[in-house]
Amino acid sequence: MEIERKLLRLLHGHNTRTRLPEIHAHLLRHFLHGSNLLLAHFISICGSLSNSDYANRVFSHIQNPNVLVFNAMIKCYSLVGPPLESLSFFSSMKSRGIWADEYTYAPLLKSCSSLSDLRFGKCVHGELIRTGFHRLGKIRIGVVELYTSGGRMGDAQKVFDEMSERNVVVWNLMIRGFCDSGDVERGLHLFKQMSERSIVSWNSMISSLSKCGRDREALELFCEMIDQGFDPDEATVVTVLPISASLGVLDTGKWIHSTAESSGLFKDFITVGNALVDFYCKSGDLEAATAIFRKMQRRNVVSWNTLISGSAVNGKGEFGIDLFDAMIEEGKVAPNEATFLGVLACCSYTGQVERGEELFGLMMERFKLEARTEHYGAMVDLMSRSGRITEAFKFLKNMPVNANAAMWGSLLSACRSHGDVKLAEVAAMELVKIEPGNSGNYVLLSNLYAEEGRWQDVEKVRTLMKKNRLRKSTGQSTICDVSV
């Protein structure tokens, strides 16, 4: 018994991750490989350390695993994945004639919630009803999570209504479920019914309102949360800062900044620092964004990307390019596809075509990143803005991806600025082909012909618009122009 207690203490010690093989060896040396209790603990620790391979190897040598061991394996795969393995162990347990208990079903339901196919979950729910475990509160919470994660809010509501006691966890699941399925009003109604709310409840509701374009209501809810004495956490900060920037409510954003500094959130979470950099970039204060960036003790690729892109948006492309160079020179963080989109935008705003071409090649050759449609679009925009419209056109025609409306729009705008009517006509006609239902493109083409006095062509465009039952409407094209 003493050796078992010692091994249990070792399993729950501070250095367990590095000592798993040593602890396992102790277990074998003292002939405890038949102790299902110890083995279940060992497998549970493997799961908490995301080491499912080791757990599986240990399980494969157990001659007579009991429900404790199977529960540990089911929980291990519910934590680490793949979730289908949990169901496999559940099936194996049943085939051996081992009865499941209440500790079997909670992780099993969690695994079912992770699967996109609800059929498995419904089978488990049926099993729960047959065995009577569905009456247990924590099991019902798992069933609610199963249905909310699968968007089956009717089924979730039925289980929720049957619960005599509902804790904050199940309320949060229902609110998030309704909001994620598009019924924000229902989610808000439930939120207002809650007698006790957690910070998770507030964050879920604020985020859901913002996602459906109701930023003003989201901010009002945040203010109500503060008035009720809740302190913002990481998720609150990351959610509310973009809302503050979108609404132009700088005082709120600065208050959140101050709170994040004093509470330690800024120090503890890279995401908070990134959100602050983004907030100040979107608010037009690149100096404050840079100060936050430099103050961050740890930075990831998002940190660099946010400030590089923010430099372009704020008309400081040169600074953004220098920042990119510093990132590469430092070498701690590798750039990704978004990094190059940001720095190419910086090149575009500063007219540095050659540097942009160099970076475009660097992305694929040195960093082995695949150029996406957005990167080709950035190159077209770079050449077009710099007046190198013939190069831009050749690039468009020879690139391996299909040109989209934004690319042809960039070229068209540049052609009109530089008086290249012939190429402008080609670009406008391509826009009409890509977006035949966008009346703004027809108006652009018609105006081009009108400026050249080609009235027969103007009439052809108008006839085509009538044929396609299109009317002139403002704001449909990304290119500004006078109407026909």
Swiss-Prot record:
Map the PPR repeats onto residue numbers: 66-100, 101-135, 136-166, 167-197, 198-232, 233-267, 269-299, 300-334, 336-366, 372-406
Q: Which Gene3D superfamilies match?
A: Tetratricopeptide repeat domain
From the record, what ranges are coiled-coil? none
What span is annotated as the signal peptide, if there is one? Answer: none
* GO terms under biological process: RNA modification
Which Pfam families does the entry link to?
Answer: E_motif (PF20431), PPR (PF01535), PPR_1 (PF12854), PPR_2 (PF13041)
- Recite the UniProt keywords alphabetically: Repeat
**MF annotations from Gene Ontology:** RNA binding
Annotated segments matching region Type E motif = 407-482
Belongs to which family?
A: Belongs to the PPR family. PCMP-E subfamily.
| Protein name as annotated | Pentatricopeptide repeat-containing protein At1g09190
Q: What species is this protein from?
A: Arabidopsis thaliana (Mouse-ear cress)
